[in-house]
Amino acid sequence: FAMLGTFLAQDLFLFYVFWEAMLIPMFLIIGLWGGERRIYATLKFVLYTAFGSILMLAALIYLVLYTHGSSGYMTFDLRHLSGSQLPLNTQLWLLSAFALSFAIKVPMFPLHTWLPDAHVEAPTTGSVILAGVLLKMGTYGFMKLGFPLFPEAARAMMPVIMTLAVISIVYGACLALVQTDIKKIIAYSSISHLGYVMLGLASLD
């Protein structure tokens, strides 16, 4: 339900609510039905995602208040916010906050270290949800919010995003090759595969 809400939301506040709500089942799956180190894996997952959530919330509030100050109209509507004429410096700061939050979910190097632990400790069903659905939401966040809301900053940051994507591709593939645990192989190969996705997104102009 929360994932469907994230896809359908045309309101920034609703997007944020659904974005956070979709993480709750994964916390419970790992924390309640995970392996021996499930508490450690869950705590690491919570800390990483909470850091990203705080950054996104701060950027969201600033964007809405800035738009209200310049237009006199307070709204969370994405169509209205995407038309805001923000200075490049402001766009860069806001995109950085959103990008860090999304990059944690992807996850991109060097924000990836929660994923191998979460994969290993999660039950098989949790690993399937992680690899098959949840990780892709980070790339969707870039497409839905990051690039459309801050187009000038996105163009300026493309070289950085592409560099991190290439590092993720090579790093994830190399580590996947030397793993003996199937879940760790999936975790590191997912980092590599999603690096390709991010490289493709960053190649768009």
What residue spans do the PLM features occupy?
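Central hydrophobic cores of alpha-helical transmembrane segments in multi-pass inner-membrane proteins
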Residues: 1-3, 22-32, 97, 101-104, ...
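Membrane-interface alpha-helices at helix entry/exit sites of multi-pass transporters
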Residues: 41-44, 122-132
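Alpha-helical multi-pass transmembrane bundles of energy-transducing inner-membrane proteins
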Residues: 2-86, 90, 175-205
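Short helix-loop-helix connector
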Residues: 34, 118-120
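Conserved hydrophobic/aromatic pocket- or pore-lining residues that grip, position, or stack substrates
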Residues: 51, 115, 136
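Acidic, glycine-rich loop-and-beta core segments that form the ion-binding/anion-interacting portion
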Residues: 116, 138-144, 148-205
